Every structure is written in structure tokens, then in C-alpha cells.
Amino acid sequence: MSAAPRIGILGAGGRMGRTLIQAVQQAGYQLAAAVERPESSLVGTDAGELAGIGSVGVKVSGSLADVLKDCDVIIDFTAPAATAQHLKLCREAGVAMVIGTTGMSDEQKAELDEAATHIPVVYAANYSVGVNVSIKLLELAAKVFGDTVDIEVIEAHHRHKVDAPSGTALMMGEAIADTLGRNLKEVAVYGREGHTGPRDRQTIGFETIRGGDIVGEHTVMFIGEGERVEVTHKATNRMNFAAGAVRAAAWVVGREARKYDMKDVLGLNDVQV
């Protein structure tokens, strides 16, 4: 698409929503809509004022249905139940979506997959370029080490995050498990307590830390005899996630209807490991 995409932001009043508004403006794209819950006191507020960048002439709406006609693509970092409703509306309107909502159930993910047969959808647990490059490195490490190491995933986030492990940690685990030919649901171990017995090398361990204002940190350890390789990504602010999501939004407009991920956006699926 040659013209600047018209982008709508859902959950505009949240931390991520405000950062997304800033990212759209920084990228030089058109902020076409900003949406909050209909009962929110922020409805009617200028979206730019809300995001701390001055007036942009776009008022926060309380209805996605009312603004879809003005948008080429919607960015959704809200909550699973809300995202499910947004998917239905965007599917009916033929509007592309970029979804960063985490904690979705298997049923909700199936609904997303179905919607993606009608509209183009980018779905990723993390839109940071650095995280997605890290995942490519994890695939390489898993391929080289194979079954010769123990694998642990450690993640840390702020005290307000409500799901655990993080979607990014699970995305990393999935990438490793797929590379090794394992089913993550069968081999994942979430935390340990009491007499656990010897570690099964086929398992992939997950540990979660919650506290303070940690934006997001992920470390994957490949632990062998006499050496350990660690791949770590640390986010210091939310702008890297927002900038990646806006990049995905510009990329997905005009694409064929299917589900994409951030590796598609970055061309990483074409990089062989």
C-alpha cells in the first residue's frame, strides 16, 4: 500500500495504548482512531493529549464499530475476551489486525485462526525486533545442542502483569521445542517445589519473576556439562514493542488473508538456521 496506513489503536488509555499512539506519530503514519471502553472517562479526550504528545485531532471513541470505516488496520493490545470481540468486528468490516494480546485460551486462539482466513492478522506475543532476533538465535542454539543440554527459560516483568509465564517466554519455549521435535505442552515444567527428583533432560523449565516496574526480561539457558550458554533480552521501555507493532501494521495492510507473525514482518522466516 503506497499511502500511509490509517491505524486505529485499541485500549488507548493503557500504558501500551499511549505508547502506541506515540509510535504511530513518530513513524509518520496516520492515527485514524483511538478506542477505549464505552464507560471510560477518557472517551472524548484528544488521543494525542492522552499520550502526552499534544493535540492530534483524534478523539478517543467508546465504540470500535463506529470508527472501523476510518481504519485500514487495528492494533490490539487489550485483554483476551475483548480481543475476541474485536476480531469479530474487524472480520465483518474487512479490516486487518495486529494483535499483541497475551493469555489467550486455546479456544480464543482458534477463533483468531478462523478470523485470519478472512482478514490478514499479525499475531505475536512480542513485537520487539530484538526479541524476534533472539528467538532465531534460540532456534540455532537448540539445533546445535540438541539433546545434550538442559534448557531453562527465566522471565521477569512488572508487578501488574496478570499472566504467567509471559507470552514471550512461551513463544521462546515453542520455538525451542519445535526445533527439537518436542511438544511444549508435554515437556514444559512450570516452577519447581519440594522433592522433584532428577531433572528430565527432555523437559523445558520455566521460572517467573514479578516485581516493581520491570518492563520485560527473558533469559534462556542451555546448560551442559562444564559450560552454559545464555541468550538474554532486556527491554528498558515499551517503545520498542510499540514501534514493532506499528511496523507490523504498516506491513500487513493489503496482504492476503492469513495469520502472520513478527518473523514474517521482519523477513526472519527466510533466514535458515
From Swiss-Prot:
Its taxonomic placement starts with: Bacteria, Pseudomonadati, Pseudomonadota, Gammaproteobacteria, Moraxellales
Which residues take part in binding (S)-2,3,4,5-tetrahydrodipicolinate? 158, 167-168
**Where along the chain is NADP(+) bound?**
37
Give the enzyme's EC designation. Answer: 1.17.1.8
User: InterPro entries recorded for this chain?
Assistant: DapB_C, DapB_N, DapB_N_CS, DHDPR_bac, NAD(P)-bd_dom_sf
Q: Which UniProt keywords apply?
A: Amino-acid biosynthesis, Cytoplasm, Diaminopimelate biosynthesis, Lysine biosynthesis, NAD, NADP, Oxidoreductase
Summarize the protein's role: Catalyzes the conversion of 4-hydroxy-tetrahydrodipicolinate (HTPA) to tetrahydrodipicolinate.
Give the source species: Acinetobacter baumannii (strain SDF)
Q: What is its main location?
A: cytoplasm
Q: What's this protein's name?
A: 4-hydroxy-tetrahydrodipicolinate reductase
Q: In which pathway does it act?
A: Amino-acid biosynthesis; L-lysine biosynthesis via DAP pathway; (S)-tetrahydrodipicolinate from L-aspartate: step 4/4
Choose any GO biological process term that the UniProt entry carries and state it: diaminopimelate biosynthetic process
